[in-house]
Amino acid sequence: MASKDVEEGVEGPICWICREEVGNEGIHPCACTGELDVVHPQCLSTWLTVSRNTACQMCRVIYRTRTQWRSRLNLWPEMERQEIFELFLLMSVVVAGLVGVALCTWTLLVILTAPAGTFSPGAVLGFLCFFGFYQIFIVFAFGGICRVSGTVRALYAANNTRVTVLPYRRPRRPTANEDNIELTVLVGPAGGTDEEPTDESSEGDVASGDKERDGSSGDEPDGGPNDRAGLRGTARTDLCAPTKKPVRKNHPKNNG
């Protein structure tokens, strides 16, 4: 009831962690809107330090954070019973593993360096079985060590680090100029393109040139269509006729 009375008497945005008015100290840490839009940076930093989360549980946006180690480290932080048990289990497994590896190595060296007939085949087989089962135990214990060490490491980091939350940067939306981009065809280099004109286009150009020459005055010649065809043939023959090179009289080949 007291929290509801406080929320009803507050005007403006409310921090979703402490349920108090944010004021000018609030930040927008993620893409959430509405009641989860603004939060106190101190409240969110404390929550992230304890929970060791890196993203918002609602919008799944990763927080922009900066982690700093405290100047005075707390080597033995306050822990619950389960955490104390996990720490004790971790230390016991590590000590047992080191002692077992040392004993197995020492026994193996003794067997290898002992003279022939010192140990019976049964004793050697028993040692090998014990060593194999012990290695299996070490493998499974190593998995438990990794799991417990992760919990202990998170607890140690939560008590000796400070997380600072930075404001959220919303993705930049494209502007109107970027949406209305038009593609333009680039013109080739000066001097024309490499494509050759087709036969149809060349014939059309020749025909248009003939029409311009024949119909410039607007009147047909006296000879009629046959004369025009003859003129076109003559013009084409003159244009296509090869040019003769001048012959030099004083050239030695010509004199011979």
From Swiss-Prot:
Q: In which pathway does it act?
A: Protein modification; protein ubiquitination
Which GO molecular function entries does the Swiss-Prot or TrEMBL record give? transferase activity; zinc ion binding
InterPro entries on file: Znf_RING, Znf_RING-CH, Znf_RING/FYVE/PHD
The region called Disordered is annotated at 179-256
- Cellular localisation: Host cell membrane; Host endoplasmic reticulum
> Principal place where this protein is found?
host cell
| Coiled-coil stretches noted in the UniProt entry, renumbered to this chain | none
Positions binding Zn(2+) 2 in this chain are 30, 32, 56, 59
The record's section on Pfam families has: RINGv (PF12906)
Q: Where is the composition biased (Acidic residues)?
A: 193-203
Q: How does it sit in the membrane?
A: Multi-pass membrane protein
What is this protein's function? Membrane-bound E3 ubiquitin ligase expressed at the immediate early stage of viral reactivation to mediate polyubiquitination of various host membrane proteins related to the immune response. Promotes ubiquitination and subsequent degradation of host MHC-I, CD86, DC-SIGN and DC-SIGNR, ICAM1 and CD1D molecules, presumably to prevent lysis of infected cells by cytotoxic T-lymphocytes and NK cell.
Name it.
Answer: E3 ubiquitin-protein ligase MIR2
Q: What organism does this protein naturally occur in?
A: Human herpesvirus 8 type P (isolate GK18) (HHV-8)
Primary gene name: K5
